[in-house]
Curated annotation (Swiss-Prot):
Protein name, as recorded: ATP synthase subunit delta
One GO MF term attached to the UniProt entry: proton-transporting ATP synthase activity, rotational mechanism
Function of the molecule: F(1)F(0) ATP synthase produces ATP from ADP in the presence of a proton or sodium gradient. F-type ATPases consist of two structural domains, F(1) containing the extramembraneous catalytic core and F(0) containing the membrane proton channel, linked together by a central stalk and a peripheral stalk. During catalysis, ATP synthesis in the catalytic domain of F(1) is coupled via a rotary mechanism of the central stalk subunits to proton translocation. This protein is part of the stalk that links CF(0) to CF(1). It either transmits conformational changes from CF(0) to CF(1) or is implicated in proton conduction.
NCBIfam families attached to this UniProt entry: ATP_synt_delta, PRK05758.3-2
UniProt KW Endoplasmic reticulum keyword: no
Origin superkingdom: Bacteria
Annotated organism of origin: Parvibaculum lavamentivorans (strain DS-1 / DSM 13023 / NCIMB 13966)
Gene encoding the protein: atpH
Pfam name, any one: OSCP
Subcellular location: Cell inner membrane
Keywords: ATP synthesis, Cell inner membrane, Cell membrane, CF(1), Hydrogen ion transport, Ion transport, Membrane, Transport
Lineage of the organism: Bacteria, Pseudomonadati, Pseudomonadota, Alphaproteobacteria, Hyphomicrobiales
Amino acid sequence: MSKDRRAPHVSSDHPVSGVAGRYATALFELADAEGALDAVAGDLERISAMLNESSDLVRLVRSPIFSAEDQTKAFGAVLEKAGISGLVKNFIGLVIRNRRLFGLSDMIGAYTTLLARKRGEMTADVVSAHPLQAAQVESLKAALKSATGRDVRINTKVDASLLGGLIVTVGSRMVDSSLRTKLNSLKIAMKEAS
């Protein structure tokens, strides 16, 4: 593959680079050539959701203790149960054979970024203390669209350590309105005052 074919052919908000970026770009270009961008995105979203829900699956992905054979068997069963086949199944197999499964979450994120660029969307990562309701996500999308002038795709994640509030990252900008940050700021201010 020539060097200029490796670079994504769409404009960027986030650089997609490194090992995860190369794998995601290869999958993206293959999916684009086969007209399967949305199908692959759906499969990757399901895998991402499974990773968010299962600490055992995360351990399988991140731990170097598991052999490629163990990862292939276990992940193969997970993919089959989730009804994921085709490009994504082959992609995961390649990632496992190359011992890069630890970077799967980054690869999924990079693919999502590439797809959003192609669609002219921005991606916002939103971390909240509690799961957001659908109405809250839609309200946040509308507010971000108003602020950026572009359609915004929202990736949500729950982190109970925030206590309350949100951390929103769009491009290189981050807004941290979490209760944890406010309490830490108050604690620092109190230490400086004494």
